[in-house]
Amino acid sequence: MGVRMWLPFPMLLLSALPATLLSGAAGFTPSLDSDFTFTLPAGQKECFYQPMPLKASLEIEYQVLDGGELDIDFHLASPEGRTLVFEQRKSDGVHTVETEDGDYMFCFDNTFSTISEKVIFFELILDNMGEEVEGQEDWKKYITNTDVLEMKLEDILESINSIKSRLSKSGHIQTLLRAFEARDRNIQESNFDRVNFWSVVNLMVMVVVSAIQVYTLKSLFEDKRKSRT
């Protein structure tokens, strides 16, 4: 039996805004992301469930960081149970879908492996375009004709959204770089152990062969004739 896990819907609290503008703050959080790293034992399958709103963009990226041949089976299903993505023996993948209202299921399957456990990293990015537009419209309710400001609320909203988008992209890139670094480090450590092991084996073989050669040469020059009395 596989293990099932529910992922909480990420929340962002904006405490620096006035209370009258909190309803428009939703325009600042169109993108929500989270990442997770776990170990999947050999012969096991683990599934995760993510509740999604209507007409959002869900991006799932996964990587096998360590274990065996760095491969895993991946399955993504819609709330109705329809298979959207099914991949076998993949080391990484990126998939984007336009979501419906409901719980999306994605599973990592390691049942084909009888020995090697896998260390798996995955990241979820949800871009809710509907809430972004609605939040921007809410901001306009608080703009009156008597407001004479050098920078309007629309400009503030645009600047904050631009900053947030750039920060989110930077965080996403840093997360991926950490995942790549972890996988490369695991590969290098595995190669290091293999090189050391075979180096020791070769050294032992060389010592044994050298000893045999010395013994053979020594035996060739020994005088085996018996002396007569």
UniProtKB/Swiss-Prot annotation:
UniProt keyword Secreted present: no
GO cellular component annotations of the record: cis-Golgi network; COPII-coated ER to Golgi transport vesicle; endoplasmic reticulum; endoplasmic reticulum exit site; endoplasmic reticulum membrane; endoplasmic reticulum-Golgi intermediate compartment; endoplasmic reticulum-Golgi intermediate compartment membrane; Golgi apparatus
Keywords: Endoplasmic reticulum, Golgi apparatus, Membrane, Protein transport, Signal, Transmembrane, Transmembrane helix, Transport
Record's signal peptide: 1-27
Entry's transmembrane regions: 197-217
Pfam families: EMP24_GP25L
Coiled-coil ranges (or none): none
UniProt-listed GO biological process terms: endoplasmic reticulum to Golgi vesicle-mediated transport; Golgi ribbon formation; intracellular protein transport
Ranges of the Cytoplasmic topological domain: 218-229
Keyword Transmembrane helix: yes
Membrane topology: Single-pass type I membrane protein
Protein's cellular compartments: Endoplasmic reticulum membrane; Golgi apparatus, cis-Golgi network membrane; Endoplasmic reticulum-Golgi intermediate compartment membrane
Domain GOLD: 45-126
Lumenal-facing ranges: 28-196
SMART domains documented for this protein: EMP24_GP25L
Similarity field: Belongs to the EMP24/GP25L family.
Subunit organization: Interacts with TMED9 and TMED10.
UniProt function note: Potential role in vesicular protein trafficking, mainly in the early secretory pathway. Required for the maintenance of the Golgi apparatus; involved in protein exchange between Golgi stacks during assembly. Probably not required for COPI-vesicle-mediated retrograde transport.
PANTHER family tied to this protein: TRANSMEMBRANE EMP24 DOMAIN-CONTAINING PROTEIN
Name of protein: Transmembrane emp24 domain-containing protein 5
Organism taxonomic ancestry: Eukaryota, Metazoa, Chordata, Craniata, Vertebrata
